[in-house]
């Protein structure tokens, strides 16, 4: 059995027994153990998700293969409440945003594209940066880990979803994109990751210093940019370029501990 053959399409078609065999092989390769294979709630698009424990830390099995990541801004139809928020909050606030929300999204979201990725293990929980970003890759490598590249992060977060957010098209009503509370952003994603759930606390660096996903450090909320733009940092394809620039600059050297990284383990 080769984990190189574990594609997302194949995972979709597998029964629980086959999923278990692949997950147990992944666990064997990293000297870990399969702690659970569970059915995924309906609406997530996947039948099962597998979590493996290695050295006291939990990792989700992320199938690879040819997958689609990014977001098709041109095809995006904002929901009525999103359009209203943009017009009456974001534009009316005088922040200088583009008149068309599609232009605003195109500035920060990566384009729709097809990529080929390996199957990997990815930490269920991201970890706080232990040092300035430039030193993190070497620190991870010393433990047999690495950072995800942007394509891998988007695939792991969206799990094949084509919507703006990993949970769907809408900004959840009556909840905030930060702090305690309930909502789809607080639930594990289809692969079992706790990811992109708090604009203040869940921002993650990647192997590319120009891409930070899962949050903006609260910039949009603090700025009062409006509901749509306050949720937008949690969009699966949002590379948060301003946040990435901040983290990579001199100010980021003093605040790196407020950001995260998600360890990845390669599989044979």
Report the location of each language-model feature.
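Low-complexity, compositionally biased segments
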Residues: 8, 18, 34, 75, ...
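Surface-exposed recognition segments
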Residues: 113, 196-268
């Amino acid at each position: 059995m080769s984990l190189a053959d574990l594609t997302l399409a194949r995972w979709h078609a597998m029964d629980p027994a086959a999923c278990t065999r692949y997950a147990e092989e992944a666990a064997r390769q990293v000297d870990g153990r399969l702690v659970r294979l569970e059915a995924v709630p309906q609406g997530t698009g996947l039948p099962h998700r597998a979590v493996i424990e290695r050295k006291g830390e939990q990792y989700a099995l992320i199938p690879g293969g040819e997958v689609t990541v990014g977001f098709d801004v041109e095809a995006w139809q904002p929901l009525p409440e999103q359009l209203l928020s943009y017009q009456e909050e974001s534009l009316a606030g005088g922040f200088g945003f583009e008149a068309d929300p599609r232009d605003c999204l195109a500035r920060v979201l990566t384009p729709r594209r097809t990529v080929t990725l390996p199957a990997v293990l990815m930490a269920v929980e991201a970890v706080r940066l232990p040092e300035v970003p430039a030193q993190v890759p070497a620190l991870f490598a010393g433990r047999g880990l690495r950072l995800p590249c942007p394509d891998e992060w988007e695939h792991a977060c969206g799990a094949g979803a084509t919507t703006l957010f990993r949970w769907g098209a809408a900004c959840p009503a009556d909840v905030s994109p930060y702090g305690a509370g309930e909502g789809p952003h607080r639930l594990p994603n289809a692969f079992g990751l706790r990811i992109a759930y708090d604009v203040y606390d869940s921002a993650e660096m990647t192997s590319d210093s120009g891409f930070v996903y899962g949050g903006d450090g609260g910039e949009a909320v603090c700025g009062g940019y409006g509901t749509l733009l306050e949720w937008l940092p949690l969009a699966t394809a949002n590379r948060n370029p301003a946040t990435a620039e901040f983290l990579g600059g001199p100010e980021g050297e003093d605040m790196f501990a407020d950001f995260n990284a998600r360890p990845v383990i390669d599989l044979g």
